Amino acid sequence: MSLWGPSKTVMVSADKALPGRASEIRVPERHYVLDTLLKPPFPVGMEVACFGMGCFWGAERLFWKTGGVYSTSVGYTGGFTLNPTYEEVCSAQTGHTEAVLVAFDPAEVSYTALLRLFWEGHNPTQGMRQGNDIGTQYRSAIYWTTPEQQAAAEASAKAYGEALRRAGFGAITTEIAPAGRFYWAEGYHQQYLAKEPGGYCGLGGTGVRYG
């Protein structure tokens, strides 16, 4: 049973979401691990991807350790509240999910390779939760930034969904939608597991391989 009750797993409507604020949350200029820019504009040739895999601490580390990734950062997206705080997102009254923004060089790592990390790195069949982390902020999501990413994401969901079905899992619940505004999370969340190596990591896949 969720400590917060069943409402934590029900998406808030736009008219009932918290209003937020006009001012953005300030974050460091550079990546704690990679020493690259944390926010755009990124160097010419970089592409941007956005994934929600539950708690963003472990998800971000998965991507910053991948060759060809220029930068990663964590934040909130997919909802309604302007410039939300972590506490507001945890209340399930913003509509946002915890997400990782990945800037990558497609000449070095493909979007398909990032999709593999995404699918194998979490359980995309759990709806508004990921393991013991329960709530709308932990939903599985792919927010695409180009038509090519959309096509690849949708095709990969179909293929991986069939692999999961054969392995006895339920249907994929991953939200696949165009990327909206990304609100960077507080500075202490950025590259959290590099600063706190023994910190919580909720990542856990199904054991089913992609492709």
From Swiss-Prot:
Reaction it catalyzes: L-methionyl-[protein] + [thioredoxin]-disulfide + H2O = L-methionyl-(S)-S-oxide-[protein] + [thioredoxin]-dithiol; [thioredoxin]-disulfide + L-methionine + H2O = L-methionine (S)-S-oxide + [thioredoxin]-dithiol
Molecular-function GO term, any one: peptide-methionine (S)-S-oxide reductase activity
A GO cellular-component term linked to this record: cytoplasm
Enzyme Commission code: 1.8.4.11
Enzyme class: oxidoreductase
Protein's UniProt keywords contain RNA-binding: no
Active site residues of this protein: C55
Keyword terms: Oxidoreductase
Any Pfam family hit: PMSR
GO biological process, one term: protein modification process
Superkingdom of origin organism: Bacteria
Function: Has an important function as a repair enzyme for proteins that have been inactivated by oxidation. Catalyzes the reversible oxidation-reduction of methionine sulfoxide in proteins to methionine.
Family: Belongs to the MsrA Met sulfoxide reductase family.
Name of the protein in question: Peptide methionine sulfoxide reductase MsrA
Species name: Paramagnetospirillum magneticum (strain ATCC 700264 / AMB-1) (Magnetospirillum magneticum)
Gene (name only): msrA
